[in-house]
């Protein structure tokens, strides 16, 4: 194994592996600090793994950023206790996961059924429901993600629901996060004997806003899986120009205010932002970006994005109670447009298999380099789900022309419509993201008996 000092030394430009392993380390400590330890001490995988890593805390670039926030960090750093003799043993698969970068791997053929069958989950939006919209092939469902250094467990919805008993999971971000949210709801629902025990959360019934908030409650487990629309994470606003005309701006110095009270106290918050920063007005940056009363005449999108991510990070560090809430950030999901962009004739139809060449590498998004740098400087540990590489290869997984039903007149489905080469069919690729989320939660506290899972998250 690599020298732990080198693995966990955060430099000014940390590697993706460093970000991953460091995030996993702190997530493990979070789960221990906020868990009830009256019945179980930390599992072998957590106590042995984290006890080795505790010494690495001395080698972080800014250790004061972790200790200056009063007692929060001290508490979770000191919560790791030795394993008791009568503690359950941990399976070798979970042990293996603890030292593995699960986001570095390849897609392999797998003829097993998806976690939920096409057409069987009523919560999939039509624009992601490729089966309903007439997609004839199913080969894109016959591949699973295989990390290079380990095997990941198959998604077990019953076990995950037990881990989430009494908890709130909130996805905050753009429609790619909504893609992942719908996938998780459907994956969990598929394991229920009584599918009617899932209820839609309605704003008027729960004192929640009707616009931009969506949620489902798993009644028998008293847990909810919610989505909040916040494509930039920062506040969309408007100003009145010198001619008295209102125009949209994006407040780079202000988190989206209307929704933060909903998720700041959630148990798990999963953020993302990326694709909306590639649209024309954000990319051009003319008279659109605002800080305080200043509207920039022109601002490069990279600088604007960096300011926005710092605003998000500052809000998280100031408002999230890290002994209660675990924070995730989902990386940039690859698009695969040919011959144009989403609004200029770009295409991806006809793709039925992933790219098989393992040496293929897409262009690593500059946005993720910004996110990685900012996360490395935060005092709140953030688990970074770097899904960029695993989506590079999946040219076959997009709705393309099957983002809506074919014309009943028999016209070609591609005629007169733009193709969706950014989002993903469901079931499909986002199910693998949630499999990695599930694996992460398993590693962070070990595979203890089912009866104890609910109290350990």
From Swiss-Prot:
Keywords of the record: Membrane, Signal-anchor, Transmembrane, Transmembrane helix
- Annotated membrane topology: Single-pass membrane protein
Motif DCXHWCLPGXXDXWN motif, chain ranges: 420-434
Q: Name where it mostly resides.
A: membrane
Q: Where is this motif: GDS motif?
A: 173-175
Q: Any stretches that span the bilayer, and where are they?
A: 19-37
A molecular function annotated in GO for this UniProt entry is:
O-acetyltransferase activity
Its annotated compartments are:
Membrane
GO CC annotation terms, alphabetical: membrane
The extra comment attached to this record reads:
Contains 2 motifs that are conserved in esterases, but it is unlikely that this protein belongs to the catalytically active pectin esterases.
User: What family classification does the UniProt entry report for this protein?
Assistant: Belongs to the PC-esterase family. TBL subfamily.
Explain the purpose of this protein: May act as a bridging protein that binds pectin and other cell wall polysaccharides. Probably involved in maintaining esterification of pectins. May be involved in the specific O-acetylation of cell wall polymers.
Its name, as the record gives it, is Protein trichome birefringence-like 4
Q: What is the lineage of its organism?
A: Eukaryota, Viridiplantae, Streptophyta, Embryophyta, Tracheophyta
User: What gene is this protein a product of?
Assistant: TBL4
